[in-house]
């Protein structure tokens, strides 16, 4: 006669059977539609594309529609006007709005990138690059007050180069026109995201000489943001979104670039798979992606130090961490 399983083993078996059901039960039902806008289309946001293509959002009961804002300023406008529910933008925008008279206040609830994903390109090969080489040169930067420019200026100052006096920063070129301006001969150096950076290199139009984020260090660069009202009214949506981000970040950290590439190709039609893999490997090398969605107080303090140093914000205008970031969702998702 076969012995009956012990109560402990029977209980463990029951839990194993119920686990998938519990995971499904946690999904929002019926699914919730979320209007989402990304700041730009870039390989910098691989964890998000993986989450979309691999059904992470669907698993969580989120029906996501996506648009591309073409700039943090435009993404914030969409959020404040109510045409987007959640946006992926630079954290500096939430600090600016916190100090404004806007009755609608944005709150950061999850982080995606651990630092700046821009690469500094030179027109000619440089055997041993030094940031002092930028002195007296024309450099394609970014929109004044934007995170890309603030991070670039921080890297310059770190290496003894005054961004206001020692270099000529070209900051008036629209996002869609930047690569074209470089190809047309503007700038002796310039900062570019992937996939543009890699495309310029492969076409012999530029040479990567530095990672801006690597020079600056780990300071949150792009974050998921919603209005305080949306977060109050939809805490389950925000928690589900943050859980998805945490899941995607862990997966990207643990997965080879060659495996990730086919999972995101639908968002980069026409691109060569080998080129996408190379771009992902480059971002992995510099530890650009966060391991956890939590945006810390230390990171926000450092960012505000940078904003003050770049003279885009007065020291007296610093925002309190808890006024800009709601960390509860990220802490629960870890």
Task: Give the predicted meaning of each segment.
Residues 1-11:
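Bacterial N-terminal signal peptides that target proteins for export
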Residues 11-20:
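Bacterial N-terminal signal peptides
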Residues 21-25:
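Sec/Tat signal peptide C-region and signal peptidase I cleavage site
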Residues 26-164, 168-174, 181, 188-194, ...:
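Short, glycine-/small- and polar/acidic-enriched structural segments
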Residues 49, 95, 153, 198, ...:
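Predominant activation on well-ordered alpha-helical scaffold segments within soluble catalytic domains
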Residues 93, 124, 176-268:
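Pocket-lining segment of extracytoplasmic ligand-binding domains
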Residues 232-314:
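Secondary-structure end/capping motifs
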Residues 304-334:
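Conserved C-terminal helix/tail region of periplasmic/extracytoplasmic solute-binding proteins
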């Amino acid at each position: 006669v076969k012995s009956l399983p012990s109560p402990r083993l029977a209980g463990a078996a029951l839990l194993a059977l119920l686990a998938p059901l519990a995971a499904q039960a946690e999904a929002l039902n019926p699914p919730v539609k979320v209007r989402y806008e990304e700041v730009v289309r870039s390989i910098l946001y691989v964890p998000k594309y993986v989450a979309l293509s691999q059904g992470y959002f669907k698993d969580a009961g989120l029906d996501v529609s996506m648009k591309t804002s073409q700039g943090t300023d435009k993404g914030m406008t969409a959020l404040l006007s109510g045409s987007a529910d959640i946006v992926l933008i630079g954290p500096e925008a939430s600090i600016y709005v916190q100090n404004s008279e806007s009755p609608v206040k944005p709150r950061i609830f999850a982080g995606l990138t651990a630092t700046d994903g821009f690469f500094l390109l030179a027109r000619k090969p440089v055997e041993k690059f030094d940031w002092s080489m930028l002195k007296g040169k024309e450099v394609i930067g970014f929109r004044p007050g934007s995170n890309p420019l603030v991070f670039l200026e921080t890297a310059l100052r770190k290496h003894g180069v005054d961004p206001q006096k020692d270099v000529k920063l070209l900051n008036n070129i629209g996002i869609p026109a930047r690569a074209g301006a470089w190809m047309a001969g503007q700038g002796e150096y310039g900062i570019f995201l992937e996939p543009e950076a890699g495309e310029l290199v492969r076409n012999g139009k530029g040479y990567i000489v530095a990672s801006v984020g690597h020079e600056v260090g780990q300071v949150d660069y792009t974050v998921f943001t919603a209005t305080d009202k949306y977060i109050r009214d939809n805490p389950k949506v925000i928690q589900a979104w943050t859980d998805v981000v945490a899941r995607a970040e862990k997966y990207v950290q643990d997965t080879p670039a060659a495996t990730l590439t086919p999972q995101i190709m639908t968002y980069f039609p026409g691109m060569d798979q080998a080129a996408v893999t190379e771009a992902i490997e480059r971002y992995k090398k510099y530890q650009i992606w966060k391991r956890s969605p939590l945006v810390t107080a230390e990171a926000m303090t450092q960012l505000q130090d940078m904003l003050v140093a770049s003279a885009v914000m007065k020291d007296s205008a610093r925002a309190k961490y808890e006024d800009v970031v709601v960390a509860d969702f990220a802490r629960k998702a870890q």
